[in-house]
Amino acid sequence: MENGHMNGVRTHHDRNSWTNGVNGGVAKREGSPDKGKAHANMSGSSVMMNGGGASFMDVDSQPPGGTKFNDLPDEIQHITADIMPLSLLLTRLSQWTHTKLQDEIAYLASKPLPQGVLNGTTNHQSADNHDTSQESLEKKVHLLNFLQDMHSKWVKTLVITEWSRKAAQVGALIDIRVHLLTKQAHYQELFWELIRMKQDLHWAKVPGPDLKTALEVLTTGQASWMPELGYIEPPPITWEEKEAFIDNINTMLSVRLTFDEHEKLPAAFRDYNIANGRVTFKVKGEFEVDLTIGDEDFEQQFWFIDFRFLFTPAPAELSHGVRTFLENKVNTILGDQGLAGCYNYLHEFVLTQKIIEFRRQATELAMGRWVDTLKVEKLNRAMSIQYWLKPPHGLEGPSSQTAKSWILLGVWSGKGVEGDLDSKPSSYISLRWFRDNKEVKDFDIPLNVETISAEKLLTAVIASHVEYILRSISSKLLSKPRFAQKHARLDLEISKEEPQNSSLAVQLFDNDKAVIKIEPLTGFFTMFPRSPVFLKGQMKLNTSSNVAEEGANLMEQLRFDHAVKDLNSRVRSIGWFVCRPPITQEETKTIVYSDASGSREAFKAVWLRKANWMTRQWFVMISMSLGGDQWWLVDLSPPKPNFPAGRLRLFTKMPMTSNQLTLSDTFFRNLSVYAAGMISHITDLRKLHTLKKSHTALELPNHSLPPQVRLPTIYVRLSEMLQQRPGSSSRTLTWAKDFVPIIFKGVRSHTGDQEGPADATAVRRDTPASIRAEARLTVIDRNKFKSLRGNVDHDVVYNHRTGQFSLKLRADMGTPVVDLLADRVQALERLMEFVEAIRLAGSNAIPQSVALREVVFTYSNDPAEPVVGPPQGPRAWNVHLDLPKDAKVVLTLEKGNPHIRALDMLQDMAQSTKTELLPSYLPFSLPLYRVLDRIEDEWESIAAKNAGNVAIVVKAAEWVTVRFTLPAPTTRRLLCLDIKTMGRKGRLLWHVKRTDEKGHERPLNAPQDEFDTLLQRSVWHAHGDGRKTFGTSAAADPKVGIETLLWSISESVKSLVGTLPPPPGTSPHPGGGTQDLQQGPQKTPQEMVAAQAAQAAQAAQAAQGMPPQRPKQQPPTPSQPQQQHRNVNQPQAQAQPQLHTQVQLQQAQVAQLQAQRQAQARANNSSNNNNTFVNRAHPGQPPQQRQSGPQTQAQQQQQRYQIQQQAQAMQRMQQQQQQQAAQQHAQQQGQGPQGQRSVHGQAGPQGVPQGQPGHGGGANGGMGGKNAPVVVID
């Protein structure tokens, strides 16, 4: 009967069992209706014992001390197994019925409705109005079957319920029957036990001895009581008969095995041999069996002859007892099962013998060399060998289970789990390996069952276990970036035969490696080389709970311990030392895990610092992990009182890999250089970033550093590094390229030891180190620096071949080098300004010594032609310029130098923006100052006699004042001369003119004195010797003319020494003495100016290549007498010169105003070309550049053409103004006749007749009064 099911839902029905049911439990219910069969004394609370008449449903519980069922004896055991309470049956059945009913309702609801119902056309033709559609009929049939099935089940339950009223009696009957069956079984077992005992005693039965027969047989050789049967012995068999008989048997065996037994022959028996009347079946690696036949009938069985083992070690022959047993057994099987049964039996027999041999050898090993390391256990046709009884890496402890490893060797039946035949046709010996309490499904351990060796098998298993452990550690390490990226070597050697030869070598540093081996007998780890660090790591491996998983981390810990130990012992001699972590672990993680490309493996940090680093906040940190070793350069802020440890300020990763960790002196010297270079690099970049300077970094070859050290080169803009010079709007150097590389050159201690190459001397720990760097400035034009020698300074070298300046920079550790670069470049720029100025000076200035802090050169005037006049002094003078780093330039002149009187002015010029003009100015002004010295020396004797003196005042570089003073009784006899520069026709000349006592220009109407007459006679009209005269002034060439000019003035003034001044109304006679002012015609100052202008115009025409024109006058006509001509010249000539003088004064004022404005504009643009001489007196002329060499003919022609064009334009403008002024004057006087205009001359192409007094118009205008040229050097 089915018990139903709960459908997975737990109910709260009563689960208590009846007394006669499960667990001896009881259940309670109301009494069932009495059908006349119940006892009168039964109630709902009656207790049912064994054999009681009440039903299980009427039993509540058994009261304590109640009687047993029917008072059965104690020998009868009460049966309670496999009995369930009736309530459980009813509950389960009701639940199952309810579930089935729900399923049935759902099923009927899922059935399709009748077609008529769907269409709305129900069939109403039936008399009983029942639905007779096919769908309804199927539902009804299905429901009827379900109800019939349920009805049958509940009827059966009803029958069981009725029988439950007699449950006590039935239970007692069951107990009695079981008791009787048990006794019957005892009797049968005893019977068979007696039979077996009788059979066993048969071998112990000894028959009684027949001594009489024995005595007769032993003495006579026969027994008289034995009857003679009279058998006739057959004739002996000959050899031919034997061979024929054997051949016959061989033939029958061959025929039988070929035709009759071919299909029945097992596959293992395919290898057989027929000879000597027997067939020998050979199963490789197992056995050989000899069989024969006893009858020609193929239906008869084979017979056993002999058996031999084919595996070793095995007995050569079977014992008599075993042979007899085997023969009987095999013959029986051959008779029943044939050859297949024979093979199966012998195959199983051999497998069992092999297992026995394995067990025997293992037992001997456990009692011999492998004592206390093996445990052999005998099983049914199987055995187990447990090795490494006390594994060092197992789980130890009261609550943990020791990891065990063993092999299980047994006979496998060859059947699958479900009983199907496996791929192997027969059973075989299988090997199962359990490693650390887990079975290994896939392994490659050779099992040799032909040559049995338990030791080799065990060695192979242990070798595989050792391989598993070492390979697990190796695989774990290889999965980490440090070994996956070949940053460290990992050598795994595996030996399948000798586990002690298997090893794992892990590289620690360079040649240092740790070799791990496992002792095959005990399983203990051994580590080489033998040292305290390795012994500690070996102990950790032996106590690990899971070496395969934790071995990689343990090896990394070992590497860190070894590294710290070696660093402490090696780096101290090189100046490094290991220090404590200056920051917390969390800050260290911030550094290590900042690399996005790195892994987040657990790491150990080693902090190093150089002893001779002046700064105490730079560290080198090594983060060692399986993710790879990383080297970091860390900068910490100074410690604070509340936070003693330094705070993290900057860190950068050093591009070094683990294979560079050689822990040698060479490596740490290179590390010192590299770290110092990085510190210098970072410090410079930080400084440049703070100053907001443009910069970049490129990695270029640096042969000053070891090949292993590669540092980037910083490029900066030279224009940004230079400070703004006073008075200059540009910071760009014109002589050097703008980009300057700063190349790191190594580290040098203050004692001079270099920490660069590997063979450098070791630096003392207490010796401060400094950074060495080099900045290279590439010049644009190498020809400008031919005068420089190799060593410009002790730390500045110029290479003529490459055209580069090498600036050696040295700074303390942590100090920016760019600050020194700016200072050196400024000093070098100042030097180059002097060198360029000396070069532009040409042959007049020759450099003698050029250094960064000192420049010495010689200068001279180098006249083009010999000077006639005063005696010449030395032609070359030395100038010494001291260029200190932070102080002003100091200019030193040798004794006797004519420029000593202008030393202060020269000193100021060297400090100003006109420094580059100094080398050109000195030879330019040397003749001037030389003649001034001569003049001053010449007048010393005169001054000593109080006959006169001379005073020379240097007001500016282009302005010198000379005052000649002669004694006079009433008035001062004073001649003041201004000597200034002027530009003319592209040349710079010295212009000498007379001024008043206060230095102002003399008015045009000033009375003429003795000095004017003297200068007009002997100076202002003298030509040649490099002089140009302008009537009231003169200009002289700076090389050959200025000395002659000034000397002639000095000699002329000396001629007045000792003479008396002329009386009033007289003027000095040209030949000496005085002349009356009333005698003869006297020229007014205006007439003199006009005459000078005419002379200047003639000079301009001569310069332009035009022939001089004589004054044009109309010849006198008869109608015009001579007196009229004189009258015209007398009264009207007085107005005409005055008018023309006013026009010239206006022109001079306009020209001077324009010259001042243009000079001011050019002064503002003077920074564009500091070597330009600006002519402020002639604004129409362009600024003239100093020529570095002689001009070509084309350049001279072009320059001459420009000057002519400018002169003609100036002349035309002046003539037009003069013509307009003359017409206006004529209109005012009312003179219209042609004859009067002819007095002035005919108007020609030049506008005004040349040569007329007061109408001269040169190309350069007048040179007197306010229109006198003023030339300055800018």
UniProtKB/Swiss-Prot annotation:
Residues 1-40, 1056-1142, 1155-1274 are annotated as: Disordered. InterPro entries: Med14_N, Mediator_Med14. Residues 1090-1104, 1120-1142, 1155-1172, 1183-1252 have a biased composition (Low complexity). Residues 27-37 have a biased composition (Basic and acidic residues). Residues 1108-1119 have a biased composition (Pro residues). GO terms for molecular function: transcription coregulator activity. One of its GO terms (cellular component) is core mediator complex. Residues 1253-1265 have a biased composition (Gly residues). It is found in: Nucleus. GO terms for biological process: regulation of transcription by RNA polymerase II. Keywords: Activator, Nucleus, Transcription, Transcription regulation. Residues 1075-1085 have a biased composition (Polar residues). Belongs to the Mediator complex subunit 14 family. Component of the Mediator complex, a coactivator involved in the regulated transcription of nearly all RNA polymerase II-dependent genes. Mediator functions as a bridge to convey information from gene-specific regulatory proteins to the basal RNA polymerase II transcription machinery. Mediator is recruited to promoters by direct interactions with regulatory proteins and serves as a scaffold for the assembly of a functional preinitiation complex with RNA polymerase II and the general transcription factors. Component of the Mediator complex. PANTHER family: MEDIATOR COMPLEX SUBUNIT, MEDIATOR OF RNA POLYMERASE II TRANSCRIPTION SUBUNIT 14. This is Mediator of RNA polymerase II transcription subunit 14. It comes from Neurospora crassa (strain ATCC 24698 / 74-OR23-1A / CBS 708.71 / DSM 1257 / FGSC 987).
